[in-house]
């Protein structure tokens, strides 16, 4: 059950006591008779109203206003004096903070004055951004009231006190704000704070009886005409406010009087100052007589300059603009000697004409500037910079490097480099890989044309170079090497073509039936390299062709002296998995991409049978006999299982260089001999892709012959047998023993053909020329392998 609030009894007002019944009527009427009102002006002689004016600061005129208020209220009662006692004390405190200045002394009527500021006002553009940082800024200085604009600036006639007026722009951070201007006339020995009045956004005289009508500060004498307030203060959406101030000069101020002031802006957030970046604002007073009519009409700019120089700072933006327009209306007459300065002043005149096009007619025609003549062509010398490198290092040009002139550089020569193949890293048959210009294009396979990457690699200079001179020397070295390579290539090819033509002419007459066995197996025993191997072994594509040609020429002459037939060097990549039990070659570097190995050594005294680029007949040494022909065959002619008892190792690299089918009549009938020669190269590298070169084997026969594909017979006088394994006739398959580094390989052969005397002289000269041709590129390219090979050849031939 809800409780109800207690009900208060209604208030009862006691009725006025009624007159006693026995009381007479006349006494009651006398008690309620009306009162009479007495006014102070009638009874006491005081004014009916008392007016007091209060100022929150002790500025100029405060003493006069206080004196007037004292005269008005001098006869007031004690109550009024008590009521106004606090206000009087506050006024006295304010007057103590800012002592009352003496009455202003106007300038004599016969003269006038100018106000000359010693500072420059900040420009209007970017004012809002600056206010965001400093909060308060002095916007403009306004002319004093009664100023007369003349040719020499704004002049104030005599009879008026010198005062300074200005506008302050503040950032509107809060509604409650106060702006004061602290001024000093004696170099800050004493100062006084003057309040600044808020300037509304609309002109105060917009309507009749406006807010600012009659105001001593915001009257038309302030210098802001109709529309000028909005012109000098563009609308910024209420983000800023303007305040106006007026500063008087000291009593008896004469010519050269000084007025220093700063602006203080007080907000609830804090107090901000504008003091001209710590230098304070200073305005000087200049007493000057009234301007003459000539001055009013306008004088030449040179004579007006001393007086007009500080005047734009003393005026607002609008007044300064109007004065500039008038000066533009009367152009300056220049003498012929001043024609040189027209080019410099042309920009200023163009800016003035573009801003005020109506002035162009009065200015007159402008003299067109003289067109600039182009400079004569000259050779510019620029310090060279590295061609390749980091972008941060490209601009760093060493000052110590002498300037060099740019010259046209020929393109790097195109060198045909066969691409890598699965078998040996080269495309096409070995016959056509380094056979020179007479090679057929159809059998060579694809070649790599010089691409942009190769050209960049040719011209690329490492960023590790110390300066521009090293880059220049590197490019010159590359150019010299390429030129030498081209010359060597042409020399090698021409010499080799003559040798081949001679060999082909010699072998054309001794033709026979060709072999039907197909291509011959590659073989080069005793470490002698073919052109294909030279290209593979050489660590750099730009030297491969020349090295192969040089080696072919060297081996050609070597075979001439040793009396060894040329064996066709071809490979049958279709025979897969045959002869994999040959010599296992371990790569010299873990990468295996660009092996850099020294050339194999040539064993003197051993019989060398080398594969070449074709079927060539060579004359044998004198006195050499031939027991019987020797026939070359392929492994496809074996009888039996070629892989019997042979283990395959696909993870290792193999190269079989077996010379088989070379037999000799040993004097015993029915005797079979099989010669197996294996050449082991230290560090040689041939990639294996599932296809091994066919291993040649021995063909049986009493009088075997060597049949070339063209049907030519080769007669061997005596063949060395460094490593021979005999087999019985019952064994049909070949017996391939593991390759061993047998010392018997270096044993001299049974019959070594001596070099004919008629060939020793030409051969010595040829080897000397070839040695010089080989040493030059080796010295340029630092090829140690070719140098070692040349030394080995020299030792082999002349030992």
Curated annotation (Swiss-Prot):
Lineage, top-rank taxon, reads: Eukaryota
Motif PP1-binding motif covers: 36-39
- For the CBM21 domain, which residue ranges apply? 128-284
Tissues expressing the protein: Expressed in brain, skeletal muscle and heart.
Q: Which residues lie on this side of the membrane: Extracellular?
A: 790-799
Q: Which GO terms are recorded in the biological process aspect for this UniProt protein? A: regulation of glycogen (starch) synthase activity; regulation of glycogen biosynthetic process
Q: Compositional bias of type Acidic residues: which residue ranges? A: 79-98, 571-581
Q: Which residues carry this modification: Phosphoserine?
A: 14, 18, 420-421, 547, 589, 594
State which residue ranges cross the membrane. Answer: 769-789
Mention any one GO cellular component term assigned to this protein in its UniProt record: protein phosphatase type 1 complex
Name the record gives this protein = Protein phosphatase 1 regulatory subunit 3F
Keywords, alphabetical = Membrane, Phosphoprotein, Transmembrane, Transmembrane helix
Q: Which GO terms describe its molecular function?
A: glycogen binding; protein phosphatase 1 binding; protein phosphatase binding
Polar residues composition bias: which ranges? Answer: 450-464
* A Pfam family it matches: CBM_21
- Determine if Transmembrane helix is one of this entry's keywords: yes
Positions in the Cytoplasmic compartment: 1-768
List the subcellular locations: Membrane
Show the segment(s) annotated as Disordered. 1-28, 53-104, 205-241, 420-471, 569-602, 723-742
- Keyword Nucleotide-binding (UniProt): no
Q: What does this protein do?
A: Glycogen-targeting subunit for protein phosphatase 1 (PP1).
Membrane-protein topology: Single-pass membrane protein
